[in-house]
Amino acid sequence: MIQSKNTHLSRADIIKNGSVFTRPELVDLVKSMVNDFISPSTIIGDFGSGYGAFIEKFKNCGLRCFGTELDDLSYNLLISEYPNINIYHENSLINISRDKYLLNENDDFIVVGNPPYNDTTSIFKKGEKGTLICDEDVVSRDFGVSFLKAYDKLHANYVCILHPLAYLIKKQNFNSLGRFKEHYKLLNATIFSSKEFESIKKSNSDFPVVAALYKKDDIGMTYEYIKQFEFNIFHSEKKFMLSKIETIDGIVEKYPKKNNKIGLQFYTLRDMNALLRNAGFVENRPSNGLEVNDDNLHQYCWLSFLKMNFKPSTNTFIFGNLSPLYTKKLEDPIFKNKIIAYAYNNIELIRKYYSMEKLEGLYGSLKTDYDELFLELKRLESLFE
């Protein structure tokens, strides 16, 4: 078997191609999830085969298997290692059809693998972006979403692949799945860290990836279905259910509005990764600053408290793509008072825009005991421990 590491690709090439090394343990996970649905007549396809980690695992399963690969060196290694398996040297998002892979209309067809994925609009921070060339009906901002749409176009009976968890748990991303979400239902899923991939271990922050098993289904799935779905966590007894996690969605503004007032602001925040990585309180940033006023000050002080102190000991990656965490304790006047006091004593910009007298007029005499704040923080940090 080929040692499946992308040693011939630069980091830029890895990003452009969406190429990552899939560890055997992750391939085994996919195999265990889909194995019960493979029959002697099943045909198995691996799109974006890399060096053949999934081909190796599934080569003796079902009736036959095939792979596809765009990268020249990977393709040549695949055809050398697997001369009896059809390997297509192609961009699999062009001219998508069952005929191309010798699939009849009624063939039992299962897709497995770790297809390329990357946001083609924001891959490179210095302006260079990936190029996605594909059939018009599978166009997406993300390679991975285009592959999911391609699997739907191929009418796969089951799909068991690795992809970013954000495709499912971020509502906008989920809606972008198009016909895939209308024709497939999630049956089983296990979350793991992107740092399980050798080629991106050195990235600054990891993000949640999911091994997901989907079944072709006339009803499909809704975002509410995903919110109530119980995800497994790799190497953990804990479970993840989106509906059980309190976030700021629908409560606190995350993106700037037009005609934002200048003055005290909070830097725009997409998710927990953005909150922890970017600035907190800022001033006079009309394009990327959220207006802070007397009514929402305690909410942004809470987010600033999170930013400064949130350090879970395990499974940190699960939080990354979630909207910033919220707590109903913010509705309690005493808890609110302590959050304001913490911000006043730790953030210079708060002291610049708010005097002690004004804050005490709004929230009462400020407390200096923060134990309750850190107890609530500890509860949130331990959600997935």
What do the PLM-derived regions correspond to, one by one?
Residues 265-385:
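C-terminal target-recognition/interaction regions appended to catalytic cores
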Residues 91, 111-118:
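Amphipathic alpha-helical repeat scaffolds
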Residues 55, 118-122, 167-172, 221-222:
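Short catalytic/ligand-binding loop motif for oxyanion handling, primarily in non-cytosolic enzymes
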Residues 118-140:
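Mobile active-site "lid"/loop adjacent to the S-adenosyl-L-methionine
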Residues 204-260:
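Flexible, glycine-/basic-rich loop-and-beta segments that form/coincide
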Residues 94-107:
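Short amphipathic alpha-helix with an adjacent loop that forms part of the alpha/beta core around
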Residues 1-79, 85-86, 91-96, 350-385:
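Class I S-adenosyl-L-methionine
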Residues 139-197, 212:
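Conserved Class I SAM-dependent methyltransferase catalytic core
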